[in-house]
């Protein structure tokens, strides 16, 4: 339950680590918490968090791969950050899609010793697809590279890769360092200094996002659990608008729309009177049983959004090189459509005269979902098949 009240004093930014497995994302996250606990000790958000704590997803233990998305908080002198440590392994790209969707900016971690790897590319592509607007690069493990020219080469490769996916590769800040050195207490240029440089880059390069505070309230449900004697809690990130205690909301999508009243709001285990766009919160819902709400639904201001099953979309189909399909697909192809926090099966109808769609194509299509999803025009989605992303799209027109 809540421990104290969440105070909003600094602008709030959502960031996260992305990059290839074992390039040091979780080590970097731990190093940031350590360095800030030392340098900005007066901010209650700053607590040193151990690597093991960040890496504590249950499946984790056997495989040494971060699976669940772990949320940390920390603050610089100017800002409060909520940080997600995104899973690095291809098997868990699905989790990354939900994690990366929460970012105002991402920290791309690349091992200077290895350079960009397949998942580096995949995560940059995903960041582009799910609309991560800014990327800052941390070239990690620089202590393992003796040749400064090699470092420059890796930096160039990363910049080119970013440009390839329409990020401004020439302008992106690149910080060189060693997260492990920083975590071990090294105060030198590659250690603590590199973490401080990275934080400065986050503060300066990632603009304070224009929050959609004035739009109607919307939260995509990520998880649901019940609290003995209090009721059902839905967690997720407020996409837009504000939510006040005791306000009425609708549960939209998958099942018939229902109304309920919000009887509690929490963020980082602290109770709040009001949540706003960008906050990751838990919401206590009156009269809703644990099995009456599920991941993939949304909580929304009454009447503000409706569920739909048929829509038109503009879609980019990943090429084989990007990890997409190797073969074309035709009308009546039935992949999964990943909206916000869940997969829904849908059938594709290509336009008149379009016989098939090749990997690497852009195309317009109509989609019929098997269950309704809360949507508006402009909503992004991923197309997935057998656990991997094969396309990305945006809803251009709602049909029914």
UniProtKB/Swiss-Prot annotation:
One of its GO terms (molecular function) is translation elongation factor activity. Gene3D superfamilies: P-loop containing nucleotide triphosphate hydrolases (3.40.50.300), Translation factors (2.40.30.10). Residues 140-143 are annotated as: G4. GTP binds at residues 19-26, 85-89, 140-143. PROSITE patterns: G_TR_1, G_TR_2. NCBIfam families: EF-Tu, PRK00049.1, PRK12735.1, PRK12736.1, small_GTP. Belongs to the TRAFAC class translation factor GTPase superfamily. Classic translation factor GTPase family. EF-Tu/EF-1A subfamily. This is Elongation factor Tu. It comes from Rubrobacter xylanophilus (strain DSM 9941 / JCM 11954 / NBRC 16129 / PRD-1). The gene is tuf1.
């Amino acid at each position: 339950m809540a421990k104290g009240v969440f105070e909003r004093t600094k602008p709030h930014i959502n960031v996260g680590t992305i990059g290839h497995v074992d390039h040091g994302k979780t080590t970097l996250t731990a190093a940031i918490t350590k360095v800030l606990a030392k340098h900005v000790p007066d901010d209650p958000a700053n607590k040193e968090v151990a690597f093991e704590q960040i890496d504590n997803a249950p499946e984790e233990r056997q495989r040494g791969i971060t699976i669940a998305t772990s949320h940390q908080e920390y603050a610089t002198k100017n800002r409060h950050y909520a940080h997600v440590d995104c899973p690095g392994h291809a098997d868990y790209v699905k989790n990354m899609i939900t994690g990366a969707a929460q970012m105002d900016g991402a920290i791309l971690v690349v091992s200077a010793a290895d350079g960009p790897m397949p998942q580096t590319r995949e995560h940059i592509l995903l960041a582009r697809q799910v609309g991560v607007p800014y990327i800052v690069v941390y070239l990690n493990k620089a202590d393992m590279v003796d040749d400064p020219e090699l470092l420059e080469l890796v930096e160039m490769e990363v910049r080119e890769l970013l440009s390839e996916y329409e990020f401004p590769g020439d302008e992106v800040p690149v910080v060189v360092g060693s997260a492990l050195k920083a975590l071990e207490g090294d105060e030198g240029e590659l250690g603590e200094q590199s973490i401080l440089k990275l934080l400065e880059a986050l503060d300066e390069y990632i603009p304070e996002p224009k929050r959609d505070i004035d739009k109607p309230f919307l939260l995509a449900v990520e998880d649901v659990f019940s609290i003995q004697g209090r009721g059902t809690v839905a967690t997720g990130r407020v996409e837009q608008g504000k939510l006040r205690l005791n306000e009425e909301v609708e549960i939209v999508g998958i099942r018939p729309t229902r109304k309920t009243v919000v009887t509690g709001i929490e963020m980082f285990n602290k109770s709040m009177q009001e949540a706003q766009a960008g906050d990751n919160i838990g919401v206590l819902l009156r009269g809703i049983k644990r099995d009456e709400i599920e991941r993939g639904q949304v909580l929304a201001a009454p009447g503000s959004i409706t569920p739909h099953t048929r829509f038109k979309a503009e879609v980019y189909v990943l090429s084989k090189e990007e990890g997409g399909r190797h073969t074309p697909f035709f009308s009546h192809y039935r992949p999964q459509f990943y909206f916000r926090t869940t997969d829904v099966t849908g059938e594709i109808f290509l336009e008149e005269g379009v016989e098939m769609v090749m990997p690497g194509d852009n195309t317009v299509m109509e989609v019929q979902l098997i269950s309704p999803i809360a949507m508006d025009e402009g909503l992004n989605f991923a197309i997935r098949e057998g656990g991997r992303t094969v396309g990305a799209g945006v809803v251009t027109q709602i049909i029914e």
